[in-house]
């Protein structure tokens, strides 16, 4: 009995010692100018901007996993597309009169040009090294079949020729020509099937995880930057002087630490919503989140991989979210080429791939539960789509693959679970709540804390998104001559549009292609195509979009 008592006493003393140590460490405040929560591409990009703009500012980055770029930024957890609307048909919706709207496509392409310029500038500075390790030329193609879809692609191609950003795009309805562009897609296909494709040679495959690792490695070279891994944010508290005290737990030894920061950026991917709520700022009350995961079929068989060099995007089926469009992609991951097909939607209540099953429940509050319910009731087609995706069998997924690769063999493919994407649900005065595709910077009125919510187009537009954050939070500094000069050196087209300016578009594409080692040939005249038949579209209930 005495031994048991002694053992229990020693355990109690030990636990008390750990608790006291945690409290002692928490009382030792670390001070920093900027706290970056999350070790992904958004925090890395913002940190890189600030390092150039204010080199004397101290920065601390905290990441809950054992390394950076292990969640959504990881190359295996996303599609790796340099989203520039060259092939993504959801960015060019069809109007009621049958015409094609290109405004969204132009905006997406403009944004990606900023990312290209930002990365090229970092290569010239020596921050990013060996461009082929993170970006490679992979042609972007749209591919459709069936009379209506072919007519849509004709109209899309014609509409995009109005923009200087889409010059150089090719169009064909010829089986032989399309087979030359994408052999996998055409071999074994019915020669009588009506098909059409567009192809743009300057498309890219991007490893966002590698970009993240290199950016953070460069930040670490400065003594006023600190990276803390296996460190999870447990609390955020605003101080009277508008600084923030953030409690961070060391997941390895159980201790805690307080970090006092003048500015906090929450770039924690799916976890950003919960941390934003934890901050208590009133702006957070308008938001909720709904997690959707994605799976891909992967082939590493050389017979498949060496027979396909393109990203080929199709058109979403009727009743499916426009962004759910399937695609068969060349990827360059871990230094080698692979082919991915998907995505297939999955459901988990986790907000991160390495998150908790309680994430969805714990983010639901009295202020956002009604917007969530309204979104669910107003988007029954989306709910049906997600249920149908979750119920897919191995055979179902393989049949979907064969629509894009008729001669596919099951033994060449394996299923891979990619990352989680938390869709934004925002309070809406008219509808109660709406599902928002895209990303959104949410900040307090004082500009002391900001979070990035949303999932698409995500990493490919990290550079323009963080520019938007700088303008929103550091408006006075952004307008200063010093910051203006630095930003224009970092992003040469900053403050102006490339669309409509052929010379400027070609100049920036030539510059970034040379620095990043990408293919770029001066665009030739547009292909002649059959005139599209613009037919009025039947009135259909709009399907809410989601990012997979």
Curated annotation (Swiss-Prot):
Required cofactors, per record?
A: FAD
Q: Which Pfam families match?
A: Mqo (PF06039)
Write out the biased-composition intervals (Low complexity).
Answer: 530-541
The kind of enzyme this is, by top-level EC class, is oxidoreductase
Alphabetically sorted, this entry's keywords are: FAD, Flavoprotein, Oxidoreductase, Tricarboxylic acid cycle
Q: Where are the transmembrane segments?
A: none
Q: What PANTHER family does the entry give?
A: L-2-HYDROXYGLUTARATE DEHYDROGENASE, MITOCHONDRIAL
Q: What is this protein called?
A: Probable malate:quinone oxidoreductase
Instruction: Give the gene that encodes this protein.
Output: mqo
């Amino acid at each position: 009995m005495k031994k048991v008592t002694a053992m229990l006493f020693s355990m109690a003393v030990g636990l008390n010692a750990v608790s006291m140590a945690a409290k002692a460490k928490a009382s030792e405040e670390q001070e920093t100018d900027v706290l970056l929560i999350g070790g992904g591409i958004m925090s890395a990009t913002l940190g890189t901007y600030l390092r150039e703009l204010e080199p004397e500012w101290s920065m601390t980055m905290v990441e809950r996993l054992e390394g950076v770029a292990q969640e959504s930024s990881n190359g295996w957890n996303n599609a790796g597309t340099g989203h520039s609307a060259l092939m993504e048909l959801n960015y060019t919706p069809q109007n009621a009169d049958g015409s094609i709207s290109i405004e969204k496509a132009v905006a997406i392409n403009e944004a990606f040009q900023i990312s290209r310029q930002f990365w090229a500038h970092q290569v010239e500075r020596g921050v990013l090294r060996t461009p082929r390790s993170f970006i490679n030329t992979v042609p972007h193609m749209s591919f459709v079949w069936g009379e209506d879809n072919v007519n849509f692609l004709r109209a899309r191609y014609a509409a995009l020729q109005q923009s200087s950003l889409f010059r150089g795009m090719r169009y064909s309805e010829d089986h032989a020509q399309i087979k030359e562009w994408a052999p996998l897609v055409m071999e074994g296909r019915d020669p009588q099937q009506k098909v059409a494709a567009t192809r743009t040679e300057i498309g890219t495959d991007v490893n966002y995880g590698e970009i993240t690792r290199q950016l953070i490695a460069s930040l670490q070279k400065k003594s006023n930057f600190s990276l803390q891994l296996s460190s999870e944010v447990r609390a955020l508290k605003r101080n009277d002087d508008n600084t923030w005290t953030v409690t961070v737990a060391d997941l390895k030894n159980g201790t805690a630490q307080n970090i006092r920061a003048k500015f906090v950026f929450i770039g924690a991917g799916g976890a950003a919503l919960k941390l934003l709520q934890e901050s208590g700022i009133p702006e957070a009350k308008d938001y909720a989140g709904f997690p959707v995961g994605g799976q891909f079929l992967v082939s590493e068989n050389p017979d498949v991989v060496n027979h396909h060099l393109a990203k080929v995007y199709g058109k979403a089926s009727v009743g499916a979210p426009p962004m759910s469009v399937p695609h068969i992609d060349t990827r360059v991951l871990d230094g080698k080429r692979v082919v991915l097909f998907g995505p297939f939607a999955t459901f988990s209540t986790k907000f991160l791939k390495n998150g908790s099953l309680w994430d969805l429940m714990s983010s639901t509050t009295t202020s956002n539960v009604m917007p969530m319910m309204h979104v669910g009731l107003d988007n029954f087609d989306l709910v049906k789509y997600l249920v149908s995706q979750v119920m897919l069998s191995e055979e179902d997924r393989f049949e979907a693959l064969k629509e894009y690769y008729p001669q596919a063999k099951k033994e060449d493919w394996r299923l891979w679970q990619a990352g989680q994407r938390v869709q934004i649900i925002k309070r809406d005065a008219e509808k109660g709540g709406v599902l928002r595709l895209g990303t959104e910077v949410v900040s307090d009125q004082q500009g002391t804390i900001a979070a990035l919510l949303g999932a698409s187009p995500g990493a490919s537009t990290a550079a323009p998104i963080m520019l938007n954050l700088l303008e929103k939070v550091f408006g006075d500094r952004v307008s200063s001559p010093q910051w203006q000069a630095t930003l224009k050196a970092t992003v040469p087209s900053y403050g102006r549009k490339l669309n409509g300016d052929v010379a400027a578009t070609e100049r920036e594409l030539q510059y970034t292609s040379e620095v990043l080692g990408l293919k770029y040939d001066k665009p030739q005249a547009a292909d002649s195509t059959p005139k599209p038949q613009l037919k009025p579209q039947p009135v259909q209930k709009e399907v809410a979009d989601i990012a997979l």
